[in-house]
């Protein structure tokens, strides 16, 4: 609302395919449907899996660099097992909510942790390309699904992936390769 109240515009389902840069100043964007939007300021809110936007930035000589990220799997468990382990009883009391957990560990100076634990949750596909295998988790408001799920991830550093450290796409390409397996 703040952006709109200040005279800004928000465009959904509108893919940016190029930047408008004049004399080293950002002036606007060009979109896939042929439109051009110019403004004194543009917020680039790329969202999930916007690898193509990193290429647009790089092609426009905007410095980008690879950074460590977390990569992992989503693990599903019967909710009853999590409740038993966390509440230390064979049957969860009806006034207690479905239990959750958080795992955090450092192994050889590398973070390994659970992420986005979804008690009474659902695993859902969320690939952005047809040839990807990507999932996420969520919990309905009542958290009444018989299963729980959680992401379990490990930190991936530049030195974990072959190739020069100066390649800004090294880790993005690695991520894309994993998601296509």
Predicted segments with their positions:
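Residues forming the flavin
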Residues: 1-181
């Amino acid at each position: 609302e703040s952006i709109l109240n200040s005279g800004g515009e928000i465009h959904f389902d509108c893919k940016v395919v190029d930047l408008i840069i004049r004399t080293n100043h950002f002036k606007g964007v060009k979109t896939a449907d042929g439109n051009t939007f110019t403004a004194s300021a543009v917020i680039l809110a790329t969202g999930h899996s916007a690898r193509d936007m990193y290429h647009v930035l790089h092609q426009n000589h905007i410095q980008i660099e690879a950074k460590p990220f977390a990569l992992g799997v989503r693990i599903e468990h019967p909710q009853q097992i999590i409740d038993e382990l966390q509440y230390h009883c064979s049957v969860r009391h009806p006034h207690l909510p479905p239990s959750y957990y958080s795992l955090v560990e450092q192994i050889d100076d590398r973070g390994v942790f659970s992420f986005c634990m979804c008690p009474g949750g659902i695993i859902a596909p969320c690939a952005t390309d047809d040839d990807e295998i990507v999932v996420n988790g969520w919990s309905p408001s009542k958290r009444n699904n018989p299963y729980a799920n959680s992401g379990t991830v490990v930190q991936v550093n530049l030195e974990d992936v072959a190739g020069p450290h100066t390649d800004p796409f090294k880790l993005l390409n690695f991520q894309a390769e994993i998601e296509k397996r």
